[in-house]
Regions:
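Soluble catalytic regions of membrane-associated enzymes that act on cell-envelope
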Residues: 405-407, 436-541
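N-terminal membrane topogenic signal
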Residues: 1-3, 372-373
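Transmembrane-helix signature of polytopic, membrane-embedded enzymes
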Residues: 100-124, 157-163, 372-375
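Extracytoplasmic catalytic/substrate-binding loops of multi-pass membrane glycan-assembly enzymes
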Residues: 18-36, 62-73, 239, 463-468
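Transmembrane alpha-helices of multi-pass, membrane-embedded glycan-processing enzymes
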Residues: 41, 78-81, 90-101, 141-144, ...
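Contiguous transmembrane helix-bundle modules in multi-pass membrane proteins
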Residues: 137-143, 151, 155-167, 171, ...
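Periplasmic/ER-lumenal interhelical loops and adjacent helix-loop junctions
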Residues: 27, 31-50, 214-297, 332, ...
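Membrane-interface helix-loop junctions at the exits of transmembrane helices
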Residues: 11-19, 44, 77-81, 85, ...
Length: 541
């Protein structure tokens, strides 16, 4: 039942992709995900494995970039079908897969159906997951994440064929090319392993051995992708000169968990809400249910795993503050973190953990002695909401988004009130009515997440990427044999961003001005490019 309802929710939220053949068009999807997928598609159709990209940065490694997903088997979908809708459906399929996997993982850990349903919905539709639809590699890794955790945990318990499945799933995730998401996956695996090892007796060594086998075999399975990547990383400018840390959460970034438009830049410049302090994700909003249920998951719970998980979430939130949180700088002094330029990505750990903690909270909602804990939790979340509202009016905000944030505040208070009332009712109602109220919490959370920031993943007609552009054709055909185009950065930046309603214009303009990787769409050789890793020789040029 949950699988069918989740599928309907994903289809309903993205009906223009499913029924009208549209594709995504915001930011990195248009200048990174789509062009790279097109390069892969054209190479494979020509019977070639794209080891090298001749069109960008005067020649650049393609397969070794890792996030090009050259060796990720599901990318064959984009080769067999029209790329625009196929790539969008690829992303939506992984979004759905991740939510379904989180449902089964939460059900395994909590043995509670409504709690597992809430976890699945939160994981599927939270702000980071919806934003990740513009990064095919990230959404693919997130979609496999709960399945890897579930398979590896089952594998170290039972061994046998399940262990082989864990190896295959883990190796498959390694081919997605999303390093941070893969690291967070295995942080969860090791947390769960440590928790079980504490309680295990003679089986402890066997569990550790089986987990080690999965790690080793998965790495061996993906070695054809990992070895070129690490070679490129070792010779890239990121390690050669030290990565520049950008996009981290400021000290008041916690307010965005309760007021998604807090400290934001408006629609007109970026086509979507962007936080002034970080540009990686448009939102990291989780809804109100996880925070209202958090106290129930942590207090008077004999199982200490939720508390360990919550402690790791706190550390992740501090890491997400980057240099301003001090902890990131201290760890960086011991173990260089240049490979992660965006500390805000540590919020992904909270995005994974909070749905599971919410599921534990639902399980313990009706247990005796928890009434006081629930009311204290509601009061604390209410105080944080009030503080966020006060800061919204008294802390200096970017002028572009202040009016929008003030307009959104009453709507947020209504959603908070509706969620809090539903949680209280679920605590007091008995019998069949209680189950209905619990699924009401799931429905409220899903609706809240889907509407908390409209147009998180806007779509455009697939033809926006396919229309023949005379200017691009001239550059591609009437050039000097060894020549390359080199647009100014100012011209590029002026074309990449703009209001949502202008996306059908922005994408052709982006192609005309060769913004980032748009040159791959029209096969125009370019001096520059938009990649995670760059060779030092290109940087010097």
């Amino acid at each position: 039942m949950f699988a069918a309802l989740l599928a309907l929710a994903v289809i309903g939220a993205n009906h223009r992709v499913i029924f009208f053949g549209e594709t995504f068009g915001l930011r990195d999807f248009s200048v990174f995900g789509y062009p790279l997928a097109l390069q892969l598609q054209e190479s494979l159709k020509a019977g070639e494995l794209p080891l090298w990209n001749l069109l960008s940065e005067c020649g650049h490694p393609f397969l070794a970039q890792w996030n090009t997903m050259t060796l990720y088997p599901p990318m064959l979908l984009t080769v067999l079908f029209p790329l625009g809708p196929a790539l969008a459906i690829f992303c939506l399929g992984h979004q759905y897969l991740g939510g379904l996997g989180m449902y089964f993982l939460a059900r395994r850990w909590t043995r509670n159906g409504p709690g597992a349903a809430l976890a699945g919905v939160l994981f599927t539709f939270d702000g980071i997951m919806q934003t990740s639809l513009m990064w095919p590699n990230n959404i693919a890794a997130l979609g496999l994440l709960p399945w890897v955790i579930l398979a590896v945990q089952t594998g170290w318990r039972t061994g046998g064929q399940v262990l082989l499945g864990a190896v295959l799933l883990s190796g498959l995730q390694l081919l997605t090319g999303a390093p941070e998401m893969i690291v967070f996956t295995w942080m969860f695996v090791l947390l769960a392993l440590g928790h079980e090892c504490k309680r295990a007796g003679a089986e402890r060594k066997q569990m550790l051995l089986r987990c080690g086998v999965v790690i080793g075999m998965a790495a061996l399975l993906a070695a054809v992708q990992l070895l070129p990547f690490f070679d490129l990383l070792a010779n890239s400018e990121r390690l050669a000169s030290g990565g520049r840390v950008t996009s981290y959460v400021k000290w008041y970034g916690w307010a965005n968990f309760f007021l998604p438009f807090f400290e934001c830049l408006g629609w007109e410049r970026y086509g979507g809400i962007i936080h002034a302090s970080q540009i990686w994700t448009h939102s990291y909003y989780l809804g109100y249910a996880p925070w209202l249920l958090l106290g129930l998951a942590l207090f008077r719970n004999r199982n200490d795993f939720p508390r360990n998980l919550a402690a790791c979430v706190i550390f992740a939130l501090i890491f997400a503050m980057g240099p301003t949180g001090r902890l990131y700088s201290w760890v960086d002094a011991i173990m260089p973190l240049e490979w992660m330029r965006y500390p805000v990505k540590f919020l992904t750990f909270a995005k994974i953990a909070m749905p599971l903690l919410a599921a534990w909270g639902v399980r313990r909602l009706s247990m005796p002695g928890n009434r006081k804990v629930l009311w204290i939790s509601i009061a604390m979340v209410g105080v944080l909401m009030g503080l966020a509202v006060w800061m919204q009016y008294n802390v200096r905000l970017p002028r572009e988004g202040a009016e929008l944030a003030h307009w959104n505040m009453p709507i947020r208070l209504q959603w908070f009130g509706a969620t809090a009332i539903a949680v209280v009712l679920a605590r007091h109602v008995r019998g069949k009515g209680r189950r209905l109220v619990l699924f009401g919490i799931v429905g409220i959370s899903a609706a809240d997440l889907l509407v908390h920031q409209p147009k998180l993943s806007p779509t455009v007609a697939a033809g926006s990427y396919q229309t023949e552009l005379k200017h691009a054709q001239e550059l591609a055909t009437a050039r000097h044999p060894d020549g390359r185009a080199m647009p100014s950065m100012q011209a590029v930046e002026s074309q990449v961003y703009g209001p949502l309603h202008e996306l059908p214009r922005i994408i052709p303009d982006m192609r005309t001005w060769l913004a980032h990787n748009a040159n791959l769409i029209d096969r125009v050789p370019l001096v520059g490019g938009f990649y995670s890793l760059h060779l030092p020789q290109f940087r010097r040029l």
